[in-house]
UniProtKB/Swiss-Prot annotation:
Catalytic reaction equation(s): AMP + ATP = 2 ADP; ATP + H2O = ADP + phosphate + H(+)
Name assigned to this protein: Putative adenylate kinase
Taxon lineage: Archaea, Methanobacteriati, Methanobacteriota, Methanomada group, Methanobacteria
SUPFAM superfamilies per UniProt: P-loop containing nucleoside triphosphate hydrolases
Subunit: Interacts with uS11. Not a structural component of 40S pre-ribosomes, but transiently interacts with them by binding to uS11.
GO biological process: ribosomal small subunit biogenesis; rRNA processing
Residue ranges, annotated region (NMP): 28-51
Similarity comment text for this entry: Belongs to the adenylate kinase family. AK6 subfamily.
Function: Broad-specificity nucleoside monophosphate (NMP) kinase that catalyzes the reversible transfer of the terminal phosphate group between nucleoside triphosphates and monophosphates. Also has ATPase activity. Involved in the late maturation steps of the 30S ribosomal particles, specifically 16S rRNA maturation. While NMP activity is not required for ribosome maturation, ATPase activity is. Associates transiently with small ribosomal subunit protein uS11. ATP hydrolysis breaks the interaction with uS11.
Keywords recorded for this protein, A-Z: ATP-binding, Kinase, Nucleotide-binding, Ribosome biogenesis, rRNA processing, Transferase
Species for this entry: Methanothermobacter thermautotrophicus (strain ATCC 29096 / DSM 1053 / JCM 10044 / NBRC 100330 / Delta H) (Methanobacterium thermoautotrophicum)
Disulfide cross-links: none
Amino acid sequence: MICITGTPGVGKTTLAGILRERGLEVISLGELIRQKGFVLGRDPIRGYLEADIEAACSHLQEMEGLDVVEGHLSHLCRSCSMVIVLRLHPEVLRGRLEGRGYPEGKVLENLEAEALDVCTVEAFEIHGERVHEVDTTGRSPHEVADIITDIMNGSRVCPPGGVDFSGWLLG
């Protein structure tokens, strides 16, 4: 099972749709959590759903024929054979999140997470060498899907550390 993760707005769901069109069995971790009731509650301050990641990941392991799991928490599943972290320049990400109507506080929280490599760091702490990092900035969804397909087939390697948006925080 390959897990595709990244800050909300980087293109995971769009990419998942393309991979599905290419014949892969893809599931959204967020949808699974909501549909199967793997919800522990709601964060009282930020309003986010708190997911039972262990239960959701355990359920994923039992699913047959599953190729890809996408979601901004998917890298927390220890059973991922490979993790691909999608990255996007924070200014481009800002436009997407604002376009979705995210409140300013949520936008800023996600921009900071992207600039600080939060998903990449978390993924690397759990999965080490099995983590790849892809900068989607300026690339079409189909170009990103081609890169992901190459990574999955072993013909391309995109090790973590090659994408750095930390300077955005200082600018």
